[in-house]
Curated annotation (Swiss-Prot):
Keywords: Phosphoprotein. It holds the Pfam family Flu_PA. GO terms for molecular function: RNA binding. This is Polymerase acidic protein. Implicated in endonuclease cleavage of capped RNA primers. Displays an elongation factor activity in viral RNA synthesis. Dispensable for viral transcription, but not replication. Phosphorylated on serines and threonines by host kinases, including human casein kinase II. The keyword Transcription does not apply. The gene is PA. GO terms for biological process: viral RNA genome replication. InterPro entries: PA/PA-X.
Amino acid sequence: DDFQLIPMISKCRTKEGRRKTNLYGFIIKGRSHLRNDTDVVNFVSMEFSLTDPRLEPHKWEKYCVLEIGDMLLRTAVGQVSRPMFLYVRTNGTSKIKMKWGMEMRRCLLQSLQQIESMIEAESSVKEKDMTKEFFENKSETWPIGESPKGVEEGSIGKVCRTLLAKSVFNSLYASPQLEGFSAESRKLLLIAQALRDNLEPGPSILEGYMKQLRSA
């Protein structure tokens, strides 16, 4: 109950379609009672790596590095053995940073769900699984958004990036932590639009804006 052992993992699929979990290390976290957004929780991170710390020792001054054994790696000519190291250090993060981290993760999931819906709709129309063709067809374009020129289209890669960027910006602008900054950002967009329309904002407006932006 006094400590939590949190694995650092990622999940993917192999070329054969099997699910795979990759383990990169662990985080050891003690008890914490974070009340304010700026309260800090300390933890110890332990990361597996094949990077030899002796090559660039100045990079790892804050780490305790242990050689924990060897790892067999597959190469084009067969298997080779490489020493494995464990990089250990103390670190800390605040309550608000952890909250933002969770929200940014949800942004990725949200944009992936939208892509999944597009693939399902395309598969339903063609009456077959279109996942592979969806990503490999370089010539097909998809609607991204509207501009003064009309509907903008781009590759599926650009669609993915646009959806992710929209999710991130929506998350940021909806955050009460950034309410003041968001308000000043909107003013900046209005100033930029005024300059494009050859309507020069007065010096007092710009000076006041910069002062408010710095305080926000």
